Amino acid sequence: MGKDTIADIITSIRNADMNRKGTVRIGSTNITESIVKILLREGFIENVRKHRENNQYFLILTLRHRRNKKESHKTILNLKRISRPGLRIYSNSQRIPRILGGIGIVILSTSQGIMTDREARLKRIGGEILCYIW
């Protein structure tokens, strides 16, 4: 059986966010770097650093937390894996779902790389729906 790196990074980020951790350390691959760049660009995480340890590269993510009047920290990051190795989900450009009326994002793997739902609609291309983030 293969390892699902996308599910691993989603789980790591979700667990760190629920436990109010400030940073997350994940393994660096081309797919994880593309997804992290999208998260950084969309404002779901604050900072990304690339770290090398024993000839292995890691990404260290700094999570963004919002202060609330009642709670000291509010969990604002919700991630859900959609397409998985056992069941791939594909969509064309007209049927890409909108998350919370456009507030959330859908990350797709297309023939032109990994991108958000807005970019895929503008380029009029579909692809594999990797995950929802809101």
From Swiss-Prot:
Q: What is this protein called?
A: Small ribosomal subunit protein uS8c
What is the role of the protein in this entry? One of the primary rRNA binding proteins, it binds directly to 16S rRNA central domain where it helps coordinate assembly of the platform of the 30S subunit.
Q: Subunit info? A: Part of the 30S ribosomal subunit.
What cellular component terms from Gene Ontology apply here? chloroplast; ribonucleoprotein complex; ribosome
Determine the domain of life of the protein's source: Eukaryota
Kindly list the biological process annotations in GO that this record carries: translation
- Gene Ontology molecular-function annotations: rRNA binding; structural constituent of ribosome
| Annotated signal peptide | none
Organism field: Lobularia maritima (Sweet alyssum)
Question: Which family does the entry's similarity section mention?
Answer: Belongs to the universal ribosomal protein uS8 family.
Q: Name the gene behind this protein.
A: rps8
User: Which PROSITE patterns does the protein's record reference?
Assistant: RIBOSOMAL_S8
Q: Where is the protein found, in the record's own terms?
A: Plastid, Chloroplast
Keywords, alphabetical: Chloroplast, Plastid, Ribonucleoprotein, Ribosomal protein, RNA-binding, rRNA-binding
Q: Which Pfam families match?
A: Ribosomal_S8
HAMAP family found in the cross-reference section:
Ribosomal_uS8_B
